[in-house]
Regions:
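N-terminal module-boundary/linker segments of secreted carbohydrate-active enzymes
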Residues: 22-56, 60
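Bacterial Sec-dependent N-terminal signal peptides
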Residues: 1-22
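Substrate-binding cleft and catalytic face of glycoside hydrolase catalytic domains
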Residues: 28-33, 65-160
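Generic secondary-structure transition motif, activating predominantly at the C-termini of alpha-helices
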Residues: 9-12, 62-67
Length: 160
């Protein structure tokens, strides 16, 4: 029975290949037709807990005038405050190239959540915000915004 199911599966897959291979797609672009405004393109600075997120050369390559032409930088608000400083230089360099910087937390700190685990000193992505902690969480986000501003790396947009 198992062999028969396997044969049927393989037959079904190989039978689709000629059909899929024969299909063609056509795309037409009309620059005069506009559906939405695109503010720009960018990249995300990932985990920065061990070292600075980007070197200046990397920022120049991505956000600089002779680079990729990015104009938006997204960074993660690390739930561990001791890691906030790792994004400062990259934000300063990107902003020097005119980038818009927006920051978003992937998860609130462990102390503001219920049903969560703590891993490596950070919150896991499990659980959810404790409704009793919403005001404290908002103050924590404001503290982050102020920290970055005090470092000369002001955040343009904070997304939750």
């Amino acid at each position: 029975m198992k062999r028969m199911i396997t044969l049927l599966y393989v037959t079904a897959l190989t039978g689709c290949i000629p059909l899929c291979a024969q299909r063609t797609a056509s795309v037409s672009l009309d620059p005069e037709t506009k559906f939405q405004k695109i503010d720009g393109f960018g990249g995300c600075g990932m985990n920065g807990q061990w070292a600075d997120v980007y070197t200046q050369e990397q920022v120049d390559l991505l956000w600089g005038p002779d680079g990729m032409g990015y104009n938006i930088m997204r960074i993660r608000i690390n739930p561990d405050e001791s890691n906030w400083k790792s994004y400062v230089n990259a934000v300063k360099w990107a902003k020097a190239h005119g980038a818009t910087v927006f920051a978003s937390p992937w998860t609130p700190p462990y102390r503001f959540k219920v049903g969560a685990e703590q891993t490596w000193g950070e919150s896991s992505n499990h659980g959810h915000i404790n409704t009793d902690s919403i005001e404290s969480y908002a103050k924590w986000l404001e503290r982050y915004r102020q920290f970055m501003e005090d470092q000369g790396a002001a955040i343009d947009i904070l997304s939750v």
